[in-house]
Amino acid sequence: MTNWLQKRVRLSPGETALVFEGKQETFEEIYEAVEKLAGKLFARGIRKDEMVALLGKNDRMTFLLIHALQQLGAITLFLNNRLTKKEITFQLANAEVKQVIVADAFVDKVTSGISYEELQQTTYVEPDLCKTWDLSRTASVMYTSGTTGKPKGVMQTYENHWWSAVSSVLNLGLTEKDSWLCAVPIFHISGLSIMMRSVIYGIPVYLEEHFDEEKITQLLESGKISTISVVTSMLERLLKIQGGSYHPNVRTVLLGGGPANKAVLEICKQRDIPLVQSFGMTETASQIVTLPPKDALNKIGSSGKALFPAEVKIADDGEILLKGPSITPGYLHNEKATAKAFIDGWFKTGDIGYLDEEGFLFVLERRSDLIISGGENIYPTEIEHVIGAYEAVEEVAVVGKSDAKWGSVPVAFIVVNEGFDEGVLKDICQTNLASFKIPKQITIVEHLPKTASGKIQRNKLKERHSN
């Protein structure tokens, strides 16, 4: 297939591609800057099919470098800038990285690498750019969070990114006024997929270095934005300061990272906020299942239905299986994990769930997080939704604790707000949960342990009870 950025420049050179810190740049201007950077990377010895790590942040330079590495045909390993040096070193070694490009702010996190400043000072050499892309080639690698063990490098091909973009547009549609606000990290698939869609659709990315709910709200009220991607914590922060509806041009608030609770859904309905819930993974190149606003309150807790090119089914043991062209071919240098992840062509998500009679997917739990108590299956998310509905609870995580009588019982860890009353919480649990589902212990903590990508590390909470 024709190189996407080169094709986009030929189709719509004068259309806005990037807005960062108030400055607008067209696709033609972006390409000129990308080509210059590609020449400097080429001068540094970076060639097609080489594994190059990128440690950056949500800024113009990182945005340009992602495109420049693609123009050269290099494979980009996206490093999470929140990781420790030890974690980054593991990924660099595991991926057999040839070179590291690192933002000046993060040079202490790598043993050696080319800083952004050093790259800018490099003399330009005319690069050998890719005119076409083999869709089966690996474009990017991202390591999973490793909540239960060592992270694995997820390979994402150009085909994966292409079909992710096509699936999204078939679901959400496309208009000439569209633009995508990106305040999620571009080293995660949620952010990178926005960049890919921008080029394929020909729409601008409004890139934000940090999530500032007041600034984001101003943008959503300005009429400049049609779509924004958020996770639950970001949405909740927006709702706390948002008093009315957003500008009518905002037609999609795409939520990832788990379904919204009823309270959030009702606020969104009252304020005419077009919330689209989704389910996706690094392995699926972003969203693969979505729930539109019209179904949100009727299907509370559901992630929706599979996007057009994708399929979903439930295995005999309750595991959610996926199939589709956006799904990874496997894990980098890990044939064993790749083989284990697929069964008869279906990708094993590791999540437990079910399809209701209308085909809507409900994700219940990670298989490893399921609590089996006296023969009863207990899903932590069910308990978390009940506890999380109490406004004095900021965050909650439920895990299983070994029990001599029942095998395992649920216990809860909570972060509380002012006004918390344990008696009120116990009443809520007794009213809404079967007795065997009520946490046998509730521990108040200052914060929940999380990975660099914000996922709760349940294994660390389990360790607190096993020690």
From Swiss-Prot:
Enzyme Commission number: 6.2.1.26
Biological process terms in GO annotation: fatty acid metabolic process; menaquinone biosynthetic process
Domain of life: Bacteria
Keyword Nucleotidyltransferase: no
UniProt pathway annotation: Quinol/quinone metabolism; 1,4-dihydroxy-2-naphthoate biosynthesis; 1,4-dihydroxy-2-naphthoate from chorismate: step 5/7; Quinol/quinone metabolism; menaquinone biosynthesis
Catalysed reactions, as listed in the record: 2-succinylbenzoate + ATP + CoA = 2-succinylbenzoyl-CoA + AMP + diphosphate
Short name of one Pfam family: AMP-binding
NCBIfam families: menE (TIGR01923), PRK03640.1 (NF002966)
PANTHER family (UniProt xref): ACYL-COA SYNTHETASE, MEDIUM-CHAIN ACYL-COA LIGASE ACSF2, MITOCHONDRIAL
Entry similarity comment: Belongs to the ATP-dependent AMP-binding enzyme family. MenE subfamily.
Biological role stated in the UniProt entry: Converts 2-succinylbenzoate (OSB) to 2-succinylbenzoyl-CoA (OSB-CoA).
Name of protein: 2-succinylbenzoate--CoA ligase
Organism, as annotated: Listeria innocua serovar 6a (strain ATCC BAA-680 / CLIP 11262)
